[in-house]
A protein has these predicted regions:
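Juxtamembrane interface at the cytosolic side of transmembrane helices
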Residues: 2, 234-278
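Surface-exposed intrinsically disordered loops and tails
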Residues: 77-88, 121-176, 189-198
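Extended, hydrophilic extramembrane loops/domains of integral membrane proteins
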Residues: 169-225
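Short amphipathic alpha-helical surface micro-motifs
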Residues: 17-22, 91-94, 157-162, 182-192
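Extended, compositionally biased low-complexity polar/Lys-Gly-rich tracts
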Residues: 59-63, 94-99, 107-111, 167, ...
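Feature for secretory/organellar precursors and membrane-associated catalytic proteins
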Residues: 8-12, 18-141
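Membrane-proximal loop-to-helix boundary features in eukaryotic membrane proteins
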Residues: 216-240
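Alpha-helical transmembrane segments
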Residues: 4-15, 240-243
Length: 278
């Protein structure tokens, strides 16, 4: 085995070791049997014109962790709460949770915005509003421990949305999160006011919590599906091709660099041998 082949083999082994290590880390950290989910829609994108690292885009694979695992590490926080603690995930404040989406056949992966406790008498309490510096209002009461009627927020999330929901419209009086997708165009309001779900997302409704993204890791799977192929935007597929080309370029540079070293070593050897050639 020549030197160039050895370097290539070492590079491949390092890559495989990195992938294996990441897989093991994900398995241990997630505490789930199925720790990956492919994003099939654009509801969490921050821009509809291009893909971004650190943001959940169409075709990304998302690494999941169990609710108990995330809670034990303090990694389940609403947007309102996280504004006060500084906790951020996927380009904004608060946690991104995965929950069963009512009539939707796929689970929903959206951001938790605020937790509401049901008081049992037709009112709701939101303790995280105690130190919230943003603008909010409620038609039934300005007491955050006895909310009723229409709850509204002004200029929230990275998209600067104005959102609201009628607390009296919920079909289940259960404590839980109000949720919303990050997309500034397609997800302009709470899920609970967008025909996605009709009640707060309680702990029993949450399947898992998003931990990290694998950019464009699910594009090939979506391209093979008749149901979701149209969701893969051109820029997302181009981003995957760019990533593949990057790996090819790196390996090519390693290969040609080593070939140059081998050639240089061979020429030096010939030069030394020629000194003894009479």
């Amino acid at each position: 085995m020549n030197a160039s082949t050895k370097i290539l083999v070492v590079a491949i082994c390092v890559l495989l070791a990195a992938v294996g290590g990441l897989t093991l880390y994900v398995k241990v950290s997630s505490d789930l049997d199925s720790s990956l989910s492919v994003v099939t829609s654009n509801s969490m994108q921050h821009d509809n014109s291009y893909s971004q690292l650190g943001v959940i885009d169409t075709g990304d694979a998302v690494v999941l962790q169990s609710v108990s695992q995330a809670a034990s590490k303090g990694q389940i926080q609403s947007y309102v709460e996280a504004l006060q603690t500084g906790y951020q995930t996927f380009g904004d404040y608060g946690s991104v949770i995965i929950y069963e989406g009512g009539s939707s056949k796929n689970p929903i992966i959206h951001r938790a915005i605020i937790w509401l406790d049901y008081n049992g008498n037709g009112t709701w309490s939101a303790p995280s509003l105690a130190n919230y510096k943003g603008e909010w209002s409620c038609t039934g009461s300005s007491d955050y421990m006895r909310l009723s009627g229409k709850l509204s927020f002004t200029d929230i999330t990275q998209s600067h949305k104005d959102v609201s929901v009628d607390l009296n419209s919920f079909t289940r009086n259960q404590s839980g999160f109000l949720t919303m997708g990050d997309n500034p165009t397609t997800n302009r309001n709470f899920d609970q006011n967008s025909h996605i779900i009709t009640y707060p997302i309680g702990w029993d409704n949450i399947r898992s919590v998003a931990m990290m993204e694998i950019p464009w890791g699910g594009i090939v799977k979506l391209m093979m599906s008749d149901d979701y192929r149209h969701n893969v935007m051109e820029h997302s597929f181009n981003s995957l091709l760019s990533l593949i080309m990057l790996f090819v370029t790196v390996f090519s540079l390693i290969w040609f660099s080593d070939m140059h070293i081998v050639k240089k070593s061979y020429m030096k050897k010939l030069e030394e041998e020629s000194k003894w050639d009479f």
